[in-house]
Amino acid sequence: GLLPQPTAQVRDFQQSFNALVENVSKVVIGKTIPIKQCVTALMVGGHILLEDNPGTGKTQLARGLANSISTGFKRVQFTPDLLPSDVVGVTFYDQKRGEFEFREGPIFASIVLADEINRASPKTQSALLEVMEEQKVTVDGVTHDVPQPFIVIATQNPIEQLGTYKLPEAQMDRFLIKTSIGYPGHDVSVDILKQVDITDRAQTISPVLSGDDVMRLRQVATEIYVDDAIREYIVRLVEATRHNEKITVGSSMRGALALTRCARIWAAADGRA
């Protein structure tokens, strides 16, 4: 029979999703799939790992997404000497007021770009990943919530490079999506060179959604119908990763849940409810 018509909410979701993708596409040209993946992660409330060579536009993609939403954005450049407190914040004694005060680190933003995460020490990496998982920071026994929506876009250069610490498997599991942008195609490269006077594309776009819009759209996505046949297929996919000699560690149940959440977003973005 005919497919049910999408509700007004789903149509709104589809329009908002596409508006975000189109906006970021002005910054990173000709890379619709990785952009859609990033917007999907934002709508799910998951985090993204971009693994790519230097100069492929990882930072531009993150900033393009951040500038498309009227919320806070912070960038942390990871280095071997970066301390956990440089990321999450620190408690200090205010002598004037005679009390302890918490100074927020750059993790307290709606969109956090964690640049070159594999350059940081394992201790600093795990401080970041803990916040990603818990959505809050605990320093000296006091808990501070991060703002919502909250999404970390981490970048890493491929492992062969010197002076990098590989992310452990357990940490990789905290990311909803791992993707790469890759170099632009020939024609796109020529187009980019034609517009050589634009040095920072991310500055040229304006927000299309607010943080509250994102939270509302997330709610819409959780109500998208998932058929049992789809669940069956997702479980079969996940099980297949555990019985393949080319894969050292198969997907966990977390992977199955992530697939389900992403499928809902993908369906809503396609106008299917």
Describe the residue ranges of each PLM region.
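P-loop (Walker A) phosphate-binding loop of NTP-binding proteins
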Residues: 53, 87, 155
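Walker B catalytic acidic pair
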Residues: 52, 115-116, 127
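C-terminal helical "lid" subdomain and adjoining coupling/linker elements of P-loop NTPases
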Residues: 225, 241-273
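Walker A/P-loop
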Residues: 39-79
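Conserved alpha-helical scaffold flanking the Walker A/P-loop in AAA+ ATPase domains
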Residues: 36-40, 93-113
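AAA+/P-loop NTPase substrate/partner-engagement loops
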Residues: 68-96
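Canonical AAA+ ATPase core
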Residues: 94-99, 120, 124, 132-224, ...
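Pre-Walker A (pre-P-loop) alpha-helix and adjacent loop at the N terminus of AAA/AAA+ ATPase modules
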Residues: 10-56, 235, 239
